[in-house]
């Protein structure tokens, strides 16, 4: 496909082409735990990854800041959990999260394009949002 774009006339030069990846897992990790990444950007990344034959997209969905930046006070330290949770509705981050419906749609898009989504919920190390949850 890249050759046809380079030729400009949608024709391939005469010859044989072998096109296969050297590695079984060709991945990328996006950290949306520390900074919210809009769903539209995640969809764009899935499409771009499929184009470049990348097949594994790990999305980091929870994290917290360093307490040193918050006067060493865990109660004031920023934390985020980015997936909608019906069981614990107050758990999701106020500055952005993904609904179940839109995250499932992202997984379905990725599946159609040959990209596996690996949702990463990092515990116990980055679980401040979970430990501070109050109903």
Can you say where each PLM-predicted feature lies in the sequence?
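Feature activates predominantly on carbohydrate-active enzymes
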Residues: 1-135
